[in-house]
Amino acid sequence: MLPKSDNSLLLRTDFSDDAAWAALCEAVRVPSEEGFQAHLDCISDPVYDGLTVEQLVTLVPKGGDRDHVFAFVADRIALTEPEQPILVVDLYDEPGRTFRVIPREMWGVENNLSIANMDYSEFADNADPDGVFRGFPQS
């Protein structure tokens, strides 16, 4: 089971660098220029060490009320790449579908998905060709 929380979850699945984890948790909490920020619980529990997307999906009960319809994952890529691209996993509409998001865009993803203002696919479909969401195109 996933932890109960009123906030979205950022699950640590790579425990190789404590400083990188601390830096990532700090980066995702930086407010946007407009003052928006992600509402997250940074979960560092060794029970999630090495957790795969497939395993994460199985932690969500089938049917009934769900506390979390998506989750953020701090895997090895998020903790080692310069842009810190965090994995975003759909746990509801298309369980297991993923894209990545950079910390400065995390607030928009978290805020909009948590209140169902936007759909998961709107962010996933606007990720760059490398699978990372860096914001919507400027019009």
Language-model segments: which ranges?
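Short linear, low-complexity motifs centered on an aromatic residue
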Residues: 126-139
